[in-house]
UniProtKB/Swiss-Prot annotation:
Residues 67-76, 143-158, 359-369, 421-433, 873-883, 922-941, 960-985 have a biased composition (Polar residues). It comes from Mus musculus (Mouse). The gene is Aff3. Pfam families: AF-4, AF4_int, AFF4_CHD. The lineage of its organism: Eukaryota, Metazoa, Chordata, Craniata, Vertebrata. This is AF4/FMR2 family member 3. GO terms for molecular function: DNA-binding transcription factor activity; double-stranded DNA binding.
Length: 1254
């Protein structure tokens, strides 16, 4: 543009445009000058630019006056396109920013400036938004009402000016979206003043009416006519919005925050600024022109916006007087030209309409888009179809910001799903949609009718507010729903993937999620202001009814969900969880609803409002499924899905923070709400309730909460097929309580679960949960809850029916009673112990116990038939008291050991040794994990040799029993009570074989040292060699336990190493007393030798393990040394090295015979390794390291040697060692010291019994 155009634009201030004084002063000369301006416009470059400017101003003022008059006559511009809902606030804001589109339209169409206006304003164009845009407003406003005049003003100027104005206007719009700069604000404000005055005022009026409609459901009638007039006259329609969206992308790019991404913090700030503008402008203009008071939020916006108007101080004062005339003029222009229809092509006028979607549209848009779809489907007259197309277009167009493409695709899918779901919802709740559709001839009419029809039900009351807001969102939905549908989809995707996995049968969840995304918008927008206040009231009432219903239907569930909801409510700040809050809101919304208006605060508040209002809107979505969610949610399944979806999305969003807890709660509440709505899903309610309770118990952990969320989701998905698992669990529990057989039956049905109902329930739940999630299974059920429920069940288990009680697993080994008498006596106490023990036990362990206990029960039944009623307890001296041949006792002992081990494992679940340790006094030593795994495998391998009964049990028992038996029979030296243990295969030994009961009380090294010395002194005093060797071996076992205690104690690792090394020497000495290799060697001798070799092998292995770090260091040091030494001075061959290194002649080197030289040199080097002639000189440090390294590594060699020797001897005594392996679990090189000690003590006890030693 030339300097004249620039000067003209600069001088075209809004002050002149809005200044009443100037207008009044120049009214007389304006007519003539306007005519002259036409010719002068053709000669833009005439020198008298000042005159042109003056004339132009006068012309504009005249046009403004004329337009204002004519505009007043046909004011109805934005009848339907602009929802009266609070979403209009966003519309006003956006229109404030986009309000210049009417003016821009002419320039775009006539000057082909669309590229500038449609696209992001070119930075090259000077952005003097205040003056130029003011001029632009004036020029455009003139251009529309009097394009010829505009053209006459300046043939070239119009083009340049429009371009600049378009650019500046676009930039002004951007800035209007973000009113940071005064000029920008001015431009945006002025442009938006016109657009808003035309569009915004109509919208505000419509909004006010809609608000009233929200409240009364009647005022919408007023608005529809006006809106209809506007709609028909101006051509602005929600339908037009899709084009606006098309142009909007650039606008979105310019200020996406204004309306493109309602969920984003960006729009929130821009929303506030646009809101202020639209509110003040719309409030002032609406009040001035339509006489329609802005809504309370609008008044607030007006206040805020007034503040913003104050920002552009240049034209603000002059504008204030002329605002009305200008606004009227603008409105008239908008009305005159139905430029909106023309602007629709530019697709910016529509964005100007969308401007209101900023927050409200965001909030309402999603909801509205859904309701509109619902309305369209139900057959809502204009808005339904237009909104549906608009929604689709908007979703597609508004998505171009960032996720636009994804959102568009998702929304398209969502629409398809939503359509199907809408059809379902329409079918299910067709009456409400139809009533809404029928009632809503216009968006406001639809809202009023929908509110009327929906006020019928509590949920419908929510629908009412949401539908009205959604209708106001009619134009908004495209932006908001697409942006928010996008966040919703993104949020839902994370959880949707999850839910889809869990509940693949519920695509409605996705639909609902996306709908929730829009619903979030609804949540945010409607609750934010108008709906938050107006609709909030109705929803609150309806919500109260819903609350009553919900309380009735899901009192307990609701309690938990509401508790969760409370958290979400408090977490409403989390904002992203609103969708989840939606579900929660459905459940807990009633309490949250009152806060919805409060939440109408800015974006963050919006999100929080999103939660609480989300509840409202969720109800609205559920209740208004026809309007909001119905399009996307099938009623019953979708409601369920919606509840799931809502939670799912929030969880997705919530993963950001403590949202999980809120999510879980929201899931519960949403589940509750959905359940209420679907009623048919009430069965799910108890199940979810169970899970919720479980979750509440386990809610302490976020993972638990997640799992619980998953559980709920799983429950939702699974609930239709299964009536409440909770009920099943309860029934199973009751059946278990009724009888052990029943409990076992329930276990069988549930899947081998522990005899204890708790384990049944836990396993059942676990199975269900496992289908959901492979991880966190132990956490799915809160151990507290399980333990509580299980306690009664455990107590009800009739222990008297069991000759042996493997369930003592949870008991302390001391509590375990080997004799049947002890079993019966200690059964109650031990059983009581078991309950708490299992409580402590992780779920997995419990499950394991369950499986094992089932097997044990079977074994017990068989054993109960076979076992003799009484068992004798051996004296602490390991004396066999009586021959109690209980073939099954052996198998029973295995389960007992296994169970004991299982119970022990909870103490240190990570260490197999703990499991084995079970009763070992060396609980501290149980930390060693290495031994048990191998033992288990070994035991499983050897177990096939076990009795047929044991083999049948082997599947579960061998695994657990071997592990447990490895550690289960810990040695309690002074307390070796014997249980008659009869291997089924060895009937002759049945009377002799008794199982020792090991006391697993943790004891200090000093205790074991005393015991070892006592046994050693006893052995020293004995004369009989075999008995002496036995006592030495037992003393060695005590020394091993002492070393193990040292190893686990505070003492340095060297102490146990020394103890083990001394023990090795003691065992070797004991073995020398009684040889096993001679022809006179007895089987007992060989058996004792095999046990001693086992001990030696493990001792050496353990010694190496203790010194392994040192060995590694030594190895590295030696390798480095030799590597470096070889490089520094390569050792010469024996015959050539003498002269090289020392220079002194070597007597051997002259010898021609290399052999002699080698021999002599070899002897020389061997005799004196440091001999300089050999270069083998090694530092003392290296020599010592080599020696230590060799001694350490030799332990491995010794270990394997002794192990092979023990295996050879064991093969010669397979019967004995098979029985021992079955009872105690096989010993391997990786067995723990505790297991080794118990294993050896049991074997020594049998040997002592076989030779009748006391």
């Amino acid at each position: 543009m030339d300097s004249f155009d620039l000067a003209l634009l600069q001088e075209w201030d809004l002050e002149s445009l809005w200044g009443e004084d100037i207008l009044s002063q120049r009214n007389d000369s304006l007519v003539l000058e306007v005519q002259a301006s036409a010719s002068r416009c053709r000669s833009v470059y005439e020198p008298d630019r000042n005159a042109l400017r003056r004339k132009e101003r006068e012309r504009r003022s005249q046009e403004t006056q004329q337009d204002s008059g004519s505009f007043n006559s046909g004011y109805s511009l934005f009848s339907e396109p602009y929802k009266t809902n609070k979403g209009d606030e966003l519309s006003n804001r956006i229109q404030n920013t986009l309000g210049n589109y009417d003016e821009m339209k002419d320039f775009l169409t006539d000057r082909s400036n669309q590229s500038h206006l449609v696209g992001v304003p070119k930075p090259g164009v000077p952005q003097t938004p205040v003056n130029k845009i003011d001029e632009h407003f004036g020029a455009e406003s003139r251009a529309q009402p009097q394009p010829s005049t505009v053209c006459s003003t300046a043939s070239s100027t119009p083009a340049a000016v429009p371009v600049q104005q378009g650019k500046r206007g676009a930039m002004g719009w951007q800035k209007a979206g973000h009113p940071p700069s005064d000029g920008q604000q001015r431009a945006a404000q002025q442009g938006s003043l016109r657009t808003l005055l035309g569009d915004g005022v109509g919208r505000q009026q419509t909004r006010a009416k809609q608000v009233c409609n929200m409240e009364t459901g009647l005022q919408t009638q007023e608005r529809p006519p006006a809106m209809a007039a506007k709609h028909g006259g101006s051509g602005h329609c929600v339908q037009n919005f899709p084009p606006s969206l098309a142009s909007k992308p650039s606008l979105v790019q310019q200020k996406p925050t204004a309306y493109v991404r309602p969920m984003d913090g960006q729009d929130q700030a821009p929303d506030e600024s646009p809101k202020l503008k639209s509110s003040t402008e719309t409030a002032v203009h609406c009040t001035a022109y339509r006489g329609v008071p802005a809504n309370k939020p609008e008044s607030a916006r007006a206040k805020a916006k007034l503040a913003k108007f104050s920002i552009p101080k240049q034209a603000e004062e002059s504008r204030s007087g002329e605002n009305n005339s200008c606004v009227e003029e603008i409105i008239r222009e908008m009305t005159w030209l139905p430029p909106l229809s023309a602007i629709q092509a530019p697709a910016k006028v529509e964005p100007s309409k969308f401007p209101f979607p900023n927050k409200d549209s965001q909030l309402v848009s999603s909801g509205h888009s859904n309701p509109k779809k619902a309305d369209a489907e139900p057959g809502s007259p204009d808005n339904g179809a237009s909104n549906t197309s608009t929604l689709e277009d908007d979703l597609k167009l508004s998505s171009d910001d960032e996720e636009g493409e994804q959102q568009a695709a998702q929304r398209t899918a969502l629409r398809a799903l939503a359509d199907s779901s809408v059809v379902q919802q329409t079918n299910c709740r067709g009456s409400a949609p139809s009533s809404k559709g029928g009632g809503s001839s216009s968006s406001s009419g639809g809202s009023s009718s929908s509110s009327d029809s929906e006020s019928t039900s509590g949920s419908d009351s929510e629908t009412e507010s949401s539908s009205s807001s959604s209708e106001s969102e009619g134009s908004k939905p495209p932006h908001c729903s697409s942006p928010e549908a996008e966040p919703a989809s993104s949020n839902k995707w994370q959880l949707d993937k999850w839910l889809n996995k869990v509940n693949p049968h519920k695509p409605p969840i996705l639909i609902q999620n996306e709908s929730h995304g829009p619903e979030r918008n609804q949540y945010y927008t409607p609750p934010v202001k108008d709906e938050g206040q107006d609709c909030g009231k109705l929803p609150e009432i309806c919500q109260a009814s819903l609350r009553d219903k919900e309380l009735k239907t899901t009192c307990k569930e609701e309690q938990r969900p509401r508790t969760a909801n409370k958290a979400p409510g408090s977490k409403s700040v989390k904002q992203k969880s609103p969708p989840a809050a939606v579900a929660v809101t459905a459940a807990a919304l009633p309490p949250a609803v009152p806060s919805a208006p409060t939440e109408s605060a800015p974006a963050p508040t919006r999100r929080s409002a999103g939660k609480k209002p989300t509840r409202r809107t969720e109800r609205t979505s559920a209740g208004d499924g026809a309007n909001c969610h119905r399009p996307e949610e099938p009623v019953a399944p979708d409601t369920l899905g919606a509840s799931v979806v809502g939670p799912l999305e929030p969880p997705k969003t919530r993963p950001c923070g403590n949202n999980r807890t809120g999510h879980r709660k929201e899931l519960r509440s949403s589940v509750t709400c959905e359940k209420r709505r679907t009623r048919g899903l009430s069965r799910i309610v108890p199940k979810s309730k169970e899970f919720i309770e479980t979750e509440s118990s386990s809610s302490s952990s976020s993972s638990d909460s997640d799992l619980e969320s998953e559980q709920e989701e799983y429950v939702l998905s699974k609930a239709p097929t299964t009536t409440g698992s909770e009920q099943r669990l309860k029934e199973a529990a009751s059946s278990n309580n009724n009888s052990n057989s029943n409990s076992s039956t329930s276990r069988a049905s549930v899947g081998s679960i522990n005899a204890r109902t708790t384990s049944d329930i836990a396993k059942e739940l676990e199975e269900q949960f496992y289908t959901l999630v492979p991880f966190g299974r132990n956490e799915l059920l809160s151990p507290l809850k399980d333990s509580d429920e299980v306690r009664s069940l455990w107590v009800k288990i009739d222990l008297t029916l069991l000759s042996r009680i493997p369930e003592h697993l949870s008991q302390e080994p001391g509590v375990l009673s080997a004799p049947s008498a002890k079993d019966t006596d200690s059964a109650p106490a031990s059983h009581a112990l078991d309950a708490p023990a299992e409580k402590t036990l992780p779920k997995s362990k419990r499950k394991r116990k369950c499986d094992n206990e089932d097997d044990y029960r079977e074994i017990k039944k068989v054993q109960g038939r076979k076992e003799s009623a009484s068992r004798l307890a051996a004296s602490t001296n390991n004396t066999l008291s009586g021959n109690h041949c209980n073939v099954n006792v052996n198998s029973l002992a295995i389960p007992i050991n296994k169970n004991e081990k299982m119970l022990r494992s909870p103490t240190s679940p990570l260490s197999d040794t703990c499991k084995h340790k079970y009763a070992s006094e060396d609980l501290t030593s149980s930390s060693r994990p290495h031994g048990n795994g191998l033992l288990t495998s070994a035991s499983s391998n050897k177990e096939p040799k076990a009795e047929s009964q044991l083999q049948t049990i082997a599947g579960d028992l061998t695994k657990a029993s071997h592990n447990s038996s490895e550690n289960g029979t810990l040695h309690s030296k002074s307390r070796p009570q014997t249980e008659p243990w009869s291997p089924g295969s060895n009937g002759h030994r049945d009377c002799k074989r008794q199982k020792l009961i090991f006391d697993d009380m943790p004891r200090s090294a000093d205790y074991f040292m005393r015991e070892a010395k006592r046994m050693k002194h006893k052995a020293d005093a004995m004369v009989e060699k075999f008995g002496k060797a036995l006592n030495y071996a037992e003393a060695a076992l005590s020394f091993i336990e002492c070393g193990n205690a040292m190893e686990q104690g505070p003492m340095e690792s060297k102490s146990p190493y020394t103890m083990y090394s001394e023990t090795v020497e003691l065992i070797r000495y004991a073995m020398r007393l009684k040889t096993h290799s001679g022809p006179n060697a007895t089987p007992e001798d060989k058996q004792l030798a095999a046990l001693c070799y086992r001990c030696l092998a493990l001792l050496y292995w353990r010694m190496f393990r203790l010194k392994r770090d040192h060995a590694v260091k030594y190895s590295k040091a030696l390798i480095d040394y030799f590597k470096n030494s070889s490089k520094a001075a390569q050792a010469p061959s024996p015959w050539g090295s003498s002269g090289k290194s020392t220079g002194s002649p070597s007597p051997m080197s002259p010898n021609p015979s290399p052999a002699s030289s080698v021999g002599s040199q070899g002897s020389l080097s061997s005799s004196s390794g440091l001999s300089p002639s050999t270069i083998v000189s090694i530092p003392q440090r290296i020599h010592q390291m080599a020696a230590n390294h060799v001694s350490i590594t030799n332990s491995i060699l010794h270990s394997y040697d002794y192990w092979e020797m023990a295996d050879n001897l064991a093969k010669e005594n397979r019967e004995f060692f098979n029985d021992l392996d079955l009872l105690m679990g096989p010993v391997t090189l990786h067995s723990s010291m505790e297991h080794l000690v118990q294993y050896s003590q049991q074997g020594l006890h049998w040997l002592r019994s076989s030779v009748h030693l006391s």
